[in-house]
Each structure stands twice: as C-alpha cells, then as structure tokens.
Design a protein with these regions (language model features):
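ATP-binding/phosphotransfer module of carbohydrate and carboxylate kinases, centering on a glycine-rich
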Residues: 4-11, 51-55, 60-194
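Short, structured beta-strand-loop surface elements
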Residues: 1
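Glycine-rich phosphate-binding loop of actin/hexokinase-like ATP-binding domains
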Residues: 8-68
Length: 194
C-alpha cells in the first residue's frame, strides 16, 4: 500500500515495516517490490535478536517478533504488573480482569509510567537494531513504520531511529528518513487492493 498510496509512491528505495501481532517488512528497490525467490522477502520478524530469548511461533528462539511485537509488549507489561513494578499497569491489569493490551501500555506511557516506557523503548531498540543491518545492506532512502502497534507511543519511533542511527554506517544514514507511514494500519489493506 505504501508504494501505491503512501509517501513511498515518490521513492525508489524504501522499506516499509509493519509492527503488529507480528513484524514484517516490504522492500522496494528501483521502484519495484522485491519479493525474493519464493515470495517471502522481508520476513524480518524471524531474525534472531536473542538466542536465549523466548520460543517463537516459528519454533526458533529469540526472534524479533517474539521479543518486540504486540503480544511480546503485552506479555512484558503483564509480568511488570504481576511483579508490582508499576502501580499504574497493576491497576489497569486488575481493572481489566487480568489482561493488558498494547493500548494499555501506550496509555501508561502517556501517563509517564517508567516501566511502560522501558517496555516500549526496548521493543523499539530491538526493531531498530535489526533495521540497522538492513540499512547497511540495502541502503534505503526511507523507512516507513506502520501497523497496528506502530503508534503505541512516540518513544517507539524515537527508539527505532536512535538504534538505526547508532548501529548503521554514517554513509548509509546521511540522507535516511525514518517516519510513520501516513497510511497507518491501513497500508496492508490498501496494498492488497492495489
């Protein structure tokens, strides 16, 4: 969708990153979608970020998706609430009858909750670390961030940017733009229709 109706329509080399229940990427090179030999290019959610991390739904351990996507954010928030490390998350957890969502974590961030901020920043840093490798390899001019979890809190985007700039080569980031997709969570639907 980003290539047809978003800011990517005017860009020849970009990566669109979807952050939701999973994490994936669309890659556009020379104005064309890169799908790979079997159509699965961009499945960045299964890049390992911690070999001793949790088991992912794919069967491997420490995948980016298992560590930084929406369900992982909510699971970490539940653990923080159960441990009593955040009175606000604990209050929301009990009010929601033992459930926390990414929206709850975002709301706690906006209230200044340090534990919620740490959860979001950690996810952003992990995503940014993976994207830094892609920036060094692919050298896009733009990275667009979208998906249902992308707007959880502005600290997610800030943490992604910080990690990419810290871990990428200066030549690759000199003119790199990392911003939200203006299509938001609708990008995939728009792409399917296009």
């Amino acid at each position: 969708g980003e290539q047809y109706a978003g800011d990517g329509a005017y860009v020849d080399h970009f990566i669109f990153v979807k952050i939701g229940t999973g994490i994936g990427a669309g890659i556009v090179s020379n104005g064309r979608i890169h799908r790979g030999s079997n159509g699965c290019a961009g499945d960045i959610g299964h890049i390992c970020v911690d070999k001793s991390g949790p088991v992912c739904r794919c069967g491997n351990t420490g995948c980016l998706e298992a560590m930084a996507a929406g369900p992982a954010i909510a699971e970490r928030a539940v653990q923080v609430a159960l441990d009593g490390d955040s009175p606000l998350l604990s209050q929301i957890f009990h009010a929601n009858r033992g459930v926390l969502s990414t929206e709850d974590v975002g709301a706690a961030c906006r209230e200044g909750d340090k534990s919620a901020l740490e959860i979001v920043q950690t996810s952003g840093q992990m995503i940014g670390d993976v994207l830094a490798g892609l920036v060094n390899f692919f050298n896009p001019s733009h990275i667009f961030i979208g998906g249902g979890v992308s707007h959880i809190d502005s600290h997610l985007l800030v943490s992604i940017r910080r990690a990419v700039l810290r871990r990428s080569l200066p030549l690759a980031t000199g003119h790199l733009s990392i911003n939200y997709s203006r299509l938001g969570a609708s990008s995939g639907i728009i792409g399917a229709v296009a």
